[in-house]
Amino acid sequence: MALDLRTIFQCEPSENNLGSENSAFQQSQGPAVQREEGISEFSRMVLNSFQDSNNSYARQELQRLYRIFHSWLQPEKHSKDEIISLLVLEQFMIGGHCNDKAGVKEKWKSSGKNLERFIEDLTDDSINPPALVHVHMQGQEALFSEDMPLRDVIVHLTKQVNAQTTREANMGTPSQTSQDTSLETGQGYEDEQDGWNSSLKTTQVNENITNQGDQIVSLIIIQEENSPRPEEGGVSSDNPYNSKRAELVTARSQEGSINGITFQGVPMVMGAGCISQPEQSSPESALTHQSNEGNSTCEVHQKGSHGVRKSYKCEECPKVFKYLCHLLAHQRRHRNERPFVCPECQKGFFQISDLRVHQIIHTGKKPFTCSICKKSFSHKTNLRSHERIHTGEKPYTCPFCKTSYRQSSTYHRHMRTHEKITVPSVPSTPEAS
């Protein structure tokens, strides 16, 4: 404990610490903290317990910490609320989510060192929100905050698994096996329109939960990390394993329970990942585009005993897929399952890449700027469409009337006008009558 406190107080120079400015506090209307209670009483009790001890270092260390806390919090001058405000602010600064400590200090000063006014003026620009973690479990998947306890994640996904099992039993469809689920973990998501790539970290957690026969639930935890894409038209020669990796982990709970384990506390064992290309399909056969997917590393487990590549056909449409993970992602569209939910507006999406594109709207950020008129856009596709105004480019040409359009939406709207044109009927002949 002493080591942790020493680390806290030595992380910044004393003149820059908020505690050095406590002399400017105005006396609050609340009751003052007496020396006989609170930190003073606690520290004195701890010090007295070491009076008869031969360990002089422990006594000196506690005395030093007592002087630091007493000098910082000044309980004879400040009220309980002021002391609590200082402790709350200090914890906020060292909690790991604050990315602009200097800005937070300035806002603390401008608020008159009043916690309520400080909270009202504080914006999300000064903090890093918890990352979202993409979790697979027995065919079910969803996004969770990285701070969410693992117990809550498993309980939530277990309910989804039970609901799907009941639904499949009513429909007479066999439930998905764990072997099929293991193949799904290799899916890599890449959005061709929003200008971002996903580097996926795959983590497998086996937790022993005491629910209905103490069965072991298998979790696949994939943490999303966004990295800028190469410039359009460029080709990256990097090995996929340099930017994408899988982390396999096995964690078993004691006595069949999980005591609030978070994702950060799970031990990791590094291993090779299984990264695939974006979803591709063909109405005829998957063999027609095998040569275009030679960079995929998910070919393991996809071949039969004689080396013949196995394909996966959708039972509801003619599409065929090379990889099971692509088929499972495609089937979500038939079932209208949208497991990736925006935490802001609760809107659901089929793929994680679609959710990432949508979340830019809530941030209000417009990182894509036109080099000519300096107008900013939230998505790269909107910037490309806008740049065609300056260049005069109209890449979408109607095959019937040869009219060109700048935007695909306008082009498709025009094509629907041709579909409404009816083919003139052939006049009847005397023989036909």
UniProtKB/Swiss-Prot annotation:
Localisation per UniProt entry: Nucleus; Chromosome, Telomere
Q: Name one GO molecular function term.
A: DNA-binding transcription factor activity, RNA polymerase II-specific
Q: Which residues form the SCAN box domain?
A: 44-126
PROSITE patterns referenced in this protein's UniProt entry, alphabetically:
SCAN_BOX, ZINC_FINGER_C2H2_1, ZINC_FINGER_C2H2_2
Q: Which keywords does UniProt give here?
A: Chromosome, DNA-binding, Metal-binding, Nucleus, Repeat, Telomere, Transcription, Transcription regulation, Zinc, Zinc-finger
Polar residues composition-biased segments = 165-185, 277-299
| Top-level taxon of origin | Eukaryota
Would I find Zinc-finger among this entry's keywords? yes
Main localization of the protein? nucleus
Q: Quote a single Gene Ontology cellular component term.
A: chromosome, telomeric region
Zinc finger boundaries on the chain: C2H2-type: 312-334, 340-362, 368-390, 396-418
Note down the stretches annotated as region Disordered: 165-196, 275-301
- InterPro entries linked: SCAN_dom, SCAN_sf, Znf_C2H2_sf, Znf_C2H2_type
* One annotated GO biological process: telomere maintenance via telomere lengthening
Pfam families per the UniProt record, alphabetical: SCAN, zf-C2H2
Q: Its biological function? A: Embryonic stem (ES) cell-specific transcription factor required to regulate ES cell pluripotency. Binds telomeres and plays a key role in genomic stability in ES cells by regulating telomere elongation. Acts as an activator of spontaneous telomere sister chromatid exchange (T-SCE) and telomere elongation in undifferentiated ES cells.
| Name under which the protein is recorded | Zinc finger and SCAN domain-containing protein 4
The organism named in the record is Pan paniscus (Pygmy chimpanzee)
Give the organism's phylogenetic lineage. Answer: Eukaryota, Metazoa, Chordata, Craniata, Vertebrata
